[in-house]
Amino acid sequence: VQRLPQYAIDKLELADVHRLSRGARIKVAVIDSGIDTSHPELAGALDRSGDMLTGQPARDADADSHGTGMASAVFARSQLTGVAPAASLLAVRAFKGTTTGDRSGAQGTSWHVLKGIDWSVAEGARVLNLSFAGPRDELVSRALAAASGRGVIAVAAAGNAGPASAPLFPASDPNVIAVTALDAENKVFAMANRGRHIAVAAPGVDVLVAQPSAGYGMTTGTSVATAHVSGLVALLIERDARLDLPQVRTLLTGTARDLGAPGRDAETGAGLINIRAALARMTQVR
């Protein structure tokens, strides 16, 4: 199989990391727009799908570029390499319509997100990928708290509303790991939201991902950075299923590569995720 170029593979040291963990048997729910689960990059990844808009299993006919791209950043296993290529996909459609760029959040409701979280937890998800951002919702916040209490780790995109924007939800919620985006030179994405709630940063500018109908394309934003971190969390949980949200947050922020001014900051949180260091620290902690 011809491999396609991905700078994130080297930046995240995936060749070395995958000798230690590939996310086997860990269910990661991608709560997003429709996912083309028939894409070669996602072959064999699907565990179950649910369409929160219809109450039925999700259909590949409703696949969208955003959801498909996010799923491939986690699970890709053909010409691309996902962060957790052996993990199991829970494909959760909570947003409808064709997305433009990184704006899938404009076409969903808190109710569909809420149903998606509950469905994912009931299906045994250990990781929730939340690559969307908007206004705070109390019911969704309660659902995230309940999920965390059951050992589920939610990872959320900081948002792409620019440095002057107020913190967006669910990234601003205490029961998620908030992620921002970096380019190949480790510069923060110019339109990423800033804030003290941001935990870590990951590759998120000009990232090659899968697109519907066996296609490929580039995506930029905190969404795909979040998917990279969700994959990392699956790798950690494969190594130790007892990990909870506070432990995962401590592992990620404690091993991240500091960027910018020394210490944690509103631009990049604790810095660039360091998967190898996080896995190594786990073995020391346990």
PLM regions and their residue ranges:
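Structural recognition of the beta-strand scaffold that forms the well-ordered cores
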Residues: K27-I31, G82, S88-R93, V121, ...
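Solvent-exposed, polar/charged alpha-helical surfaces in well-ordered, non-transmembrane soluble domains
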Residues: A15, R19, P40, T68-S72, ...
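Substrate-binding/access-modulating region of protease and related hydrolase catalytic domains
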Residues: F95-P174, K187-V188, P212-T220, V224-T226, ...
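Subtilisin-like serine protease catalytic core
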Residues: D16-R48, A58-T109, D173-N175, N193-H197, ...
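Non-catalytic propeptide/linker segments at domain boundaries
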Residues: V1-Q6
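Hydrolase catalytic cores
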Residues: A73, A94-F95, A190, G204-L272, ...
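Sec-exported extracytoplasmic/periplasmic mature domains
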Residues: R22, I35, D47, F75-Q79, ...
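Anionic-ligand binding region
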Residues: A184-I198, G215
